[in-house]
């Protein structure tokens, strides 16, 4: 009793007994179900296929570059050759670009080209149009050809140009008219025919560069009436300011000179000369007043560090009061020099530019 009470009081032992009974009943039921099911016939084994049972192709679909023909596989028939292809792949082998020294039809079996001329029809020749024209002219005994004869030479010697003639013939005409090395020669009276001849310039060797003629456009005709030389262009300036160096007598100064201007023949003289004389006379009066002021001037006075504008206003008033027209003066009177002293730079600047201010500090450092 005590033993039974201990067994029933242990819950884990009871669970183990229940699980053992459950698995015993499940295995017994599964065996009974297997005995009641009918026996199915076993499926026949799949037939085996070998590489030798495939029919050999008519030709090898692969193109090999300079490679030998493929023979039977040593793993199948014991022969020598590539071990990766079955028997039958070497009979109709086609080779691509086998090693050969010459060009022939057998070298390119994938191209339906019977001869070399048909191949040249597909490839454009490596020559410019100027080179084609030069070759056609040089290969004739007379060294001259008409435009139609140049067309015929190019089409006969270069089969590529037999098609689409409109395009390259237009380029031939374009190069003939724009290239300086091609010269047009008129026909003789006793030479019947149509069109002028074209020949090569004797100096065309200088235009020849690496087998191609350099394209040069013809120069335009000189402009009518442009016969003035450089000297005449310089004479067009009626007035000129020349700066004398410090080594010249009188020190550095600015000299106003009047250059003579001669109008070309057959043309009316320009009124620039009279205007220049008026301007030079006005400037002469202004410069003379400046010299008088400089010779009798007092030392400069500075006020509050600013420039003095009174003199500049006086100069502007005198410049505005100059007459527009005045009688002509001699060449000696037109040469007026500024005051030559050690302050000539500032004085000449004041003469040329009336708007410039006086220096705040003198060159000696005076304040």
From Swiss-Prot:
Cross-referenced PROSITE patterns, in alphabetical order? FORK_HEAD_2, FORK_HEAD_3
Q: Spell out the Low complexity composition-biased ranges.
A: 31-40
Q: Which GO terms describe its biological process?
A: anatomical structure morphogenesis; cell differentiation; regulation of transcription by RNA polymerase II
A cellular component annotation (GO) from this entry:
nucleus
SUPFAM superfamilies in the record: Winged helix' DNA-binding domain
Is the Transcription keyword given for this protein?
yes
Cellular compartments annotated: Nucleus
Q: Which domain of life is it from?
A: Eukaryota
Which is an annotated Pfam family here?
Answer: Forkhead
The Gene Ontology terms for molecular function here are:
DNA-binding transcription factor activity, RNA polymerase II-specific; RNA polymerase II cis-regulatory region sequence-specific DNA binding
Q: DNA-binding region spans which residues?
A: 124-218
Residue ranges for the region (Disordered) are 31-51, 224-254
Question: What keywords are annotated for this sequence in UniProt?
Answer: Activator, DNA-binding, Nucleus, Transcription, Transcription regulation
The answer to whether UniProt assigns keyword Secreted to this entry is no
Q: What does this protein do?
A: Possible transcriptional activator.
This chain belongs to the protein called: Forkhead box protein I2-B
Q: Native species of this protein?
A: Xenopus laevis (African clawed frog)
């Amino acid at each position: 009793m005590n033993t039974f009470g201990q067994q029933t009081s242990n819950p884990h032992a009871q669970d183990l007994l229940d699980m053992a009974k459950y698995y015993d009943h499940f295995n017994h039921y599964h065996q009974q179900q297997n005995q009641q099911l009918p026996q199915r016939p076993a499926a026949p084994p799949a037939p085996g296929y070998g590489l030798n049972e495939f029919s050999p192709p008519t030709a090898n679909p692969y193109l090999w570059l300079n490679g030998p023909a493929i023979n039977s596989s040593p793993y199948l028939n014991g022969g020598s050759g590539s071990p990766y292809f079955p028997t039958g792949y070497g009979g109709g082998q086609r080779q691509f670009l086998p090693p050969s020294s010459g060009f022939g039809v057998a070298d390119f079996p994938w191209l339906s080209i019977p001869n070399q001329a048909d191949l040249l029809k597909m490839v454009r020749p490596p020559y410019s149009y100027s080179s084609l024209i030069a070759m056609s002219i040089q290969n004739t005994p007379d060294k001259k050809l008409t435009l139609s004869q140049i067309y015929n030479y190019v089409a006969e010697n270069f089969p590529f140009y037999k098609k689409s003639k409109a395009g390259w013939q237009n380029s031939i005409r374009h190069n003939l008219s724009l290239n300086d090395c091609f010269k047009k020669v008129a026909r003789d009276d006793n030479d019947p025919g149509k069109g002028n001849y074209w020949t090569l310039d004797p100096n065309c060797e200088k235009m020849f560069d690496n087998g191609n003629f350099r394209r040069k456009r013809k120069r335009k005709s000189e402009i009518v009436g442009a016969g003035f030389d450089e000297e005449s262009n310089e004479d067009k300036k009626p007035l000129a300011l020349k700066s004398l160096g410090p080594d010249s007598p009188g020190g550095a100064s600015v000299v106003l000179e009047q250059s003579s201007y001669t109008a070309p023949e057959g043309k009316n003289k320009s009124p620039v000369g009279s205007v220049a004389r008026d301007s030079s006379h006005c400037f002469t009066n202004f410069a003379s007043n400046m010299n008088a002021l400089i010779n009798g001037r007092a030392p400069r006075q500075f006020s509050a560090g600013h420039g003095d504008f009174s003199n500049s206003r006086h100069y502007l008033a005198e410049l505005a009061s100059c007459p527009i027209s005045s009688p002509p003066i001699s060449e000696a009177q037109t040469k007026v020099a500024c005051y030559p002293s050690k302050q000539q730079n500032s004085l000449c600047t004041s003469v040329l530019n009336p708007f410039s201010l006086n220096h705040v500090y003198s060159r000696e450092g005076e304040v």
